[in-house]
């Protein structure tokens, strides 16, 4: 469990920080000219004990049998790249993502555990940089369970902190994208979106791109296949489609569709895509079609009606 590992490391670091602060206090006391030789000896002995305690913590703090602060290849954190990724997760990537999701989408997780894995998945550099996986009910109703965030270290190396990676696929953006999936998995009837009869993967991926913005990706797609090519991707969305393609251009089209829906909701007096998310969260059995209908005040009867409008008018929206 990645979160538990981070908590273990955080507790050990807090203890070492306390010892270092005490050593600093002792050094200041030792500089006082009124100290006798025996006083200075006592201060030095206490400092030595604190140093030994720091060394003990650094060599004995473990998680699942691995030394957390062992900087050798034998430790899960011995790899400096893995250590940097864990540092990025602990010092901003996760917190920033959760904060953005709460602010802009109005949803948060339900407190269920989520594993973070650095070594269980890889498809090589340039493939899937990270993914969230979970068990979706076969009835296509309800939340996902056993949710895991799996990071492909081949795409996170070198980590290039603090943002990580390079434009437009910065590591912190990738984590934000995946955390949208993780939170949606545990905050709504996510299983209904995986039903092959409706296939609403476009919304899952478009919303995940929308949280951090994907204009750079969209511009790259336009340069490659043109606005018409992007819109052709949109014709596969929903029940009329042939399933999610998964290419960068598919993500561009999905992102644009969510942007279009966001604007349509605002034009109807709502606050945007947040209204869809909040509706799904507050109505645990609701489907995306019902949420879109409610958020737009009935402008769209269902998700397919929205898709039809987007296919017809999305090109002008992109160009405009």
Regions found by a protein language model. Give the residues of each.
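Zinc-dependent metallopeptidase catalytic helix centered on the HExxH motif
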Residues: 137-220, 225
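Surface-exposed patches in mature extracellular/periplasmic domains of secreted proteins
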Residues: 66, 100-119, 190-199, 221-225, ...
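Extracytoplasmic/secreted proteins, especially bacterial periplasmic and envelope-associated proteins
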Residues: 15-18, 22-25, 42, 46-49, ...
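Sec-exported extracytoplasmic/periplasmic mature domains
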Residues: 28-32, 52-55, 59-62, 98-109, ...
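Active-site rim elements
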Residues: 7-10, 84-86, 240-248
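Amphipathic alpha-helical coiled-coil/heptad-repeat segments
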Residues: 3-81, 94, 99, 113-117, ...
